[in-house]
Amino acid sequence: MSSKAKKRVVLPTRPAPPTVEQILEDVRGAPAQDPVFTALAPEDPLEPLPRAEDSEVQQEQIYQQSRTYVAMNERLRQAGDALRQKFDGLRQAGQRLEQDISQVTSATS
């Protein structure tokens, strides 16, 4: 039997999405230990304090992140300045174009 002769399987229709009330009822009925609520829960405060090496590594990571942030912020500021200059140039070109159009229109009248 060839693949063209096979019958297509008809899938059941997709159910309607739940309403807001149904979602809220489901969330309210979930136990406190549900993974939805525990996945983002704060970590256990009884964990041992980090070692000095871990703290130094973390400080270095934070320092590097802050350097990256400052550099990206500077690039963003420069890009904003360049965009502003290009906008002003386009606005001036548009004004010149409107003047030229009005001159051509008045010259042909």
From Swiss-Prot:
Database matches in PANTHER family: UPF0449 PROTEIN C19ORF25
Family that this chain belongs to: Belongs to the UPF0449 family.
Modified residues (Phosphotyrosine): 63
InterPro entries listed in its UniProt record: UPF0449
Keywords: Phosphoprotein
Keyword Phosphoprotein (UniProt): yes
Name of protein: UPF0449 protein C19orf25 homolog
Organism name: Rattus norvegicus
Lineage: Eukaryota, Metazoa, Chordata, Craniata, Vertebrata
